[in-house]
């Protein structure tokens, strides 16, 4: 299996390629108190992974998907991402990913190690991964990416905070994991040209958004929200409609 630290080969002279399918998850666990609809149950996640595999698809990290695309491969790959770095990833998501032969990118908050989702005013307090938990996920083959230091809206950050959330978070994670950190994920999915430039200057090879609007390129990759209500039929529709609704991404094959 390719290393999750692979970076896609330079593609700036290529014509835009089809938009990659990148699934966005958050927490895996109890959905009974979930005001933001960010949690999927372990049973639902397993059904979704089973659906992927039965369609001949395999979930991988974003870095692995982009590296495969740069080689002209990866038609059978989709990227799986888990935002915020919830502690339930180790006990609930990781065993299922392993069972179904998948990997994923885990976007974590090195400024909140062992903390909780204090940025959410509603819903239960959910514990976040500790430094040891992040290292365990990396050792299991997951790509570790940055979600910023503390989960702030980068479009509202001043210059000093913007640099801390992008460049400093990357440095902290690289020291923590001992491996290069090439991926970033914009908190709340909010992004503008200034945030993109800060992420690029911080040395990230790619960054994930949700709906980047008119922005395009490897530092504003769109993603598909996956939730508890996404049955096989809904997954099929999301998979098919994604490429129809999204413009090709500049800089990708």
Model regions and ranges:
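A short, flexible beta-alpha/helix-coil linker loop
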Residues: 28-31, 111-112, 150-153
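C-terminal active-site subregion of NodB/CE4 polysaccharide deacetylases
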Residues: 2-81, 87-90, 156-253
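Acidic (Asp/Glu)-rich catalytic clusters
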Residues: 15-17, 53, 95-101, 127-146, ...
């Amino acid at each position: 299996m390719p290393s999750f630290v692979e970076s896609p080969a330079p593609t700036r002279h290529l014509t835009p390629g089809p938009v990659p399918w990148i699934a966005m998850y958050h927490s895996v666990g109890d959905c009974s108190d979930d005001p933001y609809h960010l949690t999927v149950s372990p049973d639902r996640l397993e059904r979704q992974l089973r659906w992927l595999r039965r369609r001949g698809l395999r979930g991988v990290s974003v870095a692995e998907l982009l590296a495969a695309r740069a080689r002209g491969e990866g038609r059978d790959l989709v990227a799986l991402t888990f935002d915020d770095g919830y502690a339930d990833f180790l006990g609930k998501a990781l065993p299922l990913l392993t069972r179904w032969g998948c990997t994923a990118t885990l976007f974590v908050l090195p400024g909140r190690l062992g903390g909780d989702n204090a940025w959410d005013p509603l819903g239960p307090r959910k514990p976040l991964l500790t430094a040891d938990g992040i290292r365990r996920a990396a050792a299991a083959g997951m790509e570790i990416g940055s979600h910023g230091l503390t989960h702030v809206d980068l479009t509202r950050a001043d210059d000093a905070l913007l640099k801390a959330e992008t460049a400093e978070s990357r440095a902290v994670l690289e020291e923590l994991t001992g491996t290069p950190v090439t991926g970033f994920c914009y908190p709340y999915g909010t992004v503008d040209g200034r945030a993109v430039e800060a992420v690029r200057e911080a040395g990230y090879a790619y960054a994930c958004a949700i709906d980047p609007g008119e922005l395009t390129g490897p530092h504003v990759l769109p993603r598909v929200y996956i939730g508890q209500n996404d049955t096989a039929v809904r997954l099929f529709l999301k998979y098919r409609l994604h490429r129809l609704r999204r413009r090709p991404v500049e800089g990708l094959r």
